[in-house]
Structure formats: structure tokens, C-alpha cells
Swiss-Prot record:
It comes from the Bacteria. GO terms for cellular component: plasma membrane. It is found in: Cell inner membrane. The complex is composed of two ATP-binding proteins (LolD) and two transmembrane proteins (LolC and LolE). PROSITE patterns: ABC_TRANSPORTER_1, ABC_TRANSPORTER_2, LOLD. Its EC number is 7.6.2.-. Part of the ABC transporter complex LolCDE involved in the translocation of mature outer membrane-directed lipoproteins, from the inner membrane to the periplasmic chaperone, LolA. Responsible for the formation of the LolA-lipoprotein complex in an ATP-dependent manner. This is Lipoprotein-releasing system ATP-binding protein LolD 1. The gene is lolD1. Belongs to the ABC transporter superfamily. Lipoprotein translocase (TC 3.A.1.125) family.
Length: 246
């Protein structure tokens, strides 16, 4: 379907514990993500949430089955091709920000664009500053990570993930190390990116409040979808956004 950005077909993932012992993490899972969706993935520890996210992002390959992203079959790509796809089409945000400590906010956000090599130095710097403006860090351009709070560091990481205009933004517990206020700020940023830029966002989270504020929630148990629920219509998203600024 033209509106499907990510599709998983009959995915199985086994973890090889030894030559004779395998543990099945995901036994047989199929699902699709539509363009512009804001999806949270929840479930108990060991349910396969992060494994599923890494399969979606091409950081791991399934034992069997196929993963499609924006028309590319990730499971058919070699590592060189996957490096290109990850750089160009996927933005990753982790529980820890992984910012380079010796670089400023602008330099950290610039890094994926420098690797991509499709913009001039001026274009890269201009876009890095624009993205920092977008995440409301316009006064932190020259700050290094140790000169920012945890919430600010994570917002720099989000700006970095957006650097190459990814088709999909993937987050693995992005608020896990943050206090409740900073976590709420990150949620509101994701919500704004989704509403205003129609950015497709998929986030693994243990945070129930965060999980239920997305437009769709997928809950895993033992590597299988226990439920897949639409949480909000476009109208309810607009009404909630209005209440936040009223």
C-alpha cells in the first residue's frame, strides 16, 4: 500500500545461546506502520520490544521473514547498503544520548550530514542550527554535552536523529533516564514533530503515560502482539495540542 512506510512479514527472531540451544524472542509477527503515525511499543521486560525496534531499523536481521522500509527490503541488503539506508532514512534515539563529548551541539547535530556528504559545510551548519531551533535549543549552539541538562542533551540527540530528514524516527526508551518534567518535554516534542511535520515516529517505552499519548499503541507479550490499538484520531490530537497552549 502506498501509505505503508514500514512492513514486517512473518518475522521470526531466534537468539543462539549455544551451538545446540536457541531461544525464540519473536516467534511469528507481522505488522505495518503507516506514514505519519506516532506509535508506541510496550510490554513487559523480555517481551521483544527492543528486538522488534532493532529489526525495524535494520540494526539486526530476523532469523526468517522480511522487513520493508519505504520500498526497500532491508532483509535483502548487505551491510554497506544498510549503512546507507540507516544514514538516509532512519533516525535513532536511545535511552542514553550518545553525544560526542568534545563536540558542541551544532557539531553533534552536523555529524550525520557530514557522513552523508550531500550538503555543503554551510548548508550543514545552517540545518544543524535550524534543527536546534526546532527543539528549542537556540541558545545552546556552542554548548558541549557537559554544559547541558539531561533533557537538553536528549533534545540535541533528537535534532541529530532528524539531520538527514529520515522517513522514520525510532526511539528506544528515549525518556528512560529523564525526570518526569524532561520526559514530558520530550513527549511534547515528539507530538509536535508528528503533528506539524507528519514525521513517522515509533517509540519503545515502559512509561504508561507516554505510551497512551501516541496515536497507536502496540503491546507485546512473549514476542507476539497482544493488542494493537488506535488511541487518538487526528481531531483529538489537534484538541489536545490546543489545550497544551491554552
Amino acid at each position: 500500500m502506498p501509505n505503508t512506510i514500514l512492513k514486517l512479514e512473518r518475522i521470526r527472531k531466534d537468539l543462539e545461546l549455544s551451538r545446540s540451544i536457541r531461544q525464540t524472542i519473536i516467534p511469528n509477527l507481522s505488522l505495518s506502520i503507516e506514514r505519519g503515525e506516532f506509535v508506541t511499543i510496550t510490554g513487559p521486560s523480555g517481551s521483544g520490544k527492543s528486538t522488534l525496534l532493532y529489526l525495524m531499523g535494520g540494526l539486526d536481521k530476523p532469523t526468517s521473514g522480511s522487513v520493508w522500509l519505504d520500498g526497500d527490503e532491508l532483509t535483502a541488503k548487505n551491510e554497506s547498503e544498510m549503512n546507507r539506508i540507516r544514514n538516509e532514512k532512519i533516525g535513532f534515539i536511545y535511552q542514553f544520548h550518545f553525544l560526542l563529548p568534545e563536540f558542541t551541539a551544532v557539531e553533534n547535530v552536523s555529524m550525520p550530514m557530514l557522513i552523508n556528504g550531500r550538503r555543503s559545510r554551510k548548508e550543514i551548519r545552517d540545518r544543524a542550527m535550524m534543527l536546534l531551533d526546532l527543539v528549542e535549543l537556540q541558545d545552546k549552539y556552542t554548548n558541549k554535552p557537559n554544559q547541558m541538562s539531561g533533557g537538553q542533551q536528549q533534545r540535541v540527540a533528537i535534532a541529530r536523529a532528524l539531520a538527514n530528514e529520515p522517513k522514520v524516527l525510532l526511539g528506544d526508551e528515549p525518556t528512560g533516564n529523564l525526570d518526569s518534567r524532561s520526559a514530558n518535554n520530550v513527549y511534547q516534542l515528539f507530538d509536535r514533530l508528528n503533528r506539524e511535520l507528519q514525521q513517522t515516529i515509533i517509540v519503545v517505552t515502559h512509561d504508561e503515560a507516554f505510551a497512551n499519548r501516541a496515536s497507536r499503541r502496540i503491546h507485546l507479550v512473549d514476542g507476539q502482539v497482544a493488542y494493537d490499538r488506535q488511541l487518538r484520531t487526528e481531531a483529538s490530537v489537534t484538541n489536545e495540542a490546543a489545550s497544551l497552549v491554552s
